[in-house]
Amino acid sequence: MSATSLPISIAVSPRNTAVTVPPADIAVSLEHVSFRYNKEESEVLEDINLSIRPGECIVLTGESGCGKTTLTRTINGLIPLVYQGVLKGRVSVAEKPVTEWTSGDLAVTVGSVFQNPRSQFVNSEVEAELAFGCENQGLSREEIVRRIHESVRVFGIEELLHRQVEELSGGQRQMVILASVYATDPDIFVLDEPTAALDVTSMRCLGAALAKLKSMGKTIIVSEHRLWWLADLADRVVVMEDGHIAGTWSAKEFGAIPFETRLHWGLRAWKVDEVDAAAHRRFSHTSVSGHPVHECVADTSLRTRGLRVSYRHRDAVIDSCDFDISAGTVVGLVGANGAGKTTLARCLCGIQKEAAGTVELAGKALRTSQRAGVIYLAMQEPGYQLFEHTVVRELEEAHDRNGSDLPQIFSVKSLMDDFRLADLAQRHPLSLSGGQRQRTSIAAGLLYGAQALVMDEPTSGLDYNNMASIARQIDRLKQQGVVICIITHDYEFLCAACDAVLPLHDGRVSPPIPLTPETLGHIKRLLGFS
């Protein structure tokens, strides 16, 4: 929601956000809860009042940085046990204040999936990770084995059971963490951006698992930007703005709010049909297929020939990979979790060495060591490439390192404004929310001035306004002739930013498909929509 928009309570009348529920029917309650992190001047949460019944599925949404993750931390006890600050008000789980729970007992009752799944692993093997929580509960070996097999079946990850965690893709790691929490059988599930790295098939699998849990009377709290997969699952939608609850609706009431109004608030599509409609509007205003992606322009394209990439003790992750991406075309690299998309991106940018084949840019074959300066990777986990002490310094450093011969079309100030980073200028990048870190990393990449830009899941953790802003900046780079490849599972972003899709399956690419009204249905099926 922009600062100039009317308060939600005026624009559309929501339900009372402080509805009183009989005490016996409360699974989670927050009463006049406010919170300020240590070393921060302002409160991240302000006077939150929310009651959640057992068996409800509640969706928390709102613009990046509005306080969703912080609210979930008050419920699972990470605030105040891990994240220190000033907490006011009362947070209760099962009618008992969180401050009176032991950390072990609360972890058994409230199962959590964090925004960054990498931070949640404690074992190097998938099977050991799935067993870990059950072992801590003192369950018998037979029961642990039963739960492990049930959880991998429910989440469709049987083939990952005997894999090493370090071998998994981001989406596969996310599914393993979801399965490990499922195996512990908590009464309350708190999921923070659980689909950030998931493909459509995995999202549908997660939705089915949550529907099963809901039918069993489990309470589900999901903090999320990508909303379409929750439309048939949610009971209520809670929209947050600047640390407070701006409105609460039933799922039916929320879906009845006009799409354009929800977009104005910075919220993503509630139904896949809304994404389709937005895509067709884009088709009618722009010619997304105006660049012949199947033809290589020798002096302006990114090209691979016979590319093969493998990890030790494994078959090739990328095998015999040939493709061309012409400058002036935005290509979305799509494929299931574990298909090899991130591995391919790491190779293109010189982080991962190829076993065979070549990577060419502007007609010149580049060795691994030569790629880092000319092909920039905006990583899936942006915290790994943010090094400065403040956001503004991060962008200034990227601007100063710009070695491109192309005209500089971005300035630090313009991107700070466009990506809504101005108010965060003096914050440490690692103190930001996931979406804020993502915007900082992408802004740095735009300022770096590389001849080719590879973005790995750039919209994970981003609301509609920030997603649209990134799409606009990508279009500016496209007009300048920069080669752009975007790895994404985000159908909404794909329709907003890309001209074509490049399917990747089992380490091999298929011919690119222009994004047009005629091909949209085929592309949806490739992504996993029925």
Tell me the role of every PLM-derived stretch.
Residues 84-96, 357-371:
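Conserved ABC transporter NBD signature motif
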Residues 224-225, 488-489:
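H-loop/switch region of ABC-family ATPase nucleotide-binding domains
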Residues 61-63, 334-336:
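The feature captures the beta-strand-to-loop junction immediately N-terminal to the Walker
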Residues 189-192, 453-456:
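Catalytic Walker B motif of ABC-type/P-loop ATPase nucleotide-binding domains
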Residues 181-182, 445-446:
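ABC ATPase C-loop
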Residues 164-168, 172, 428-432:
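Conserved ABC ATPase signature
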Residues 76, 349:
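Helix-to-loop junction immediately C-terminal to a conserved catalytic motif
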Residues 142-160, 406-424:
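Conserved ABC ATPase "signature" region
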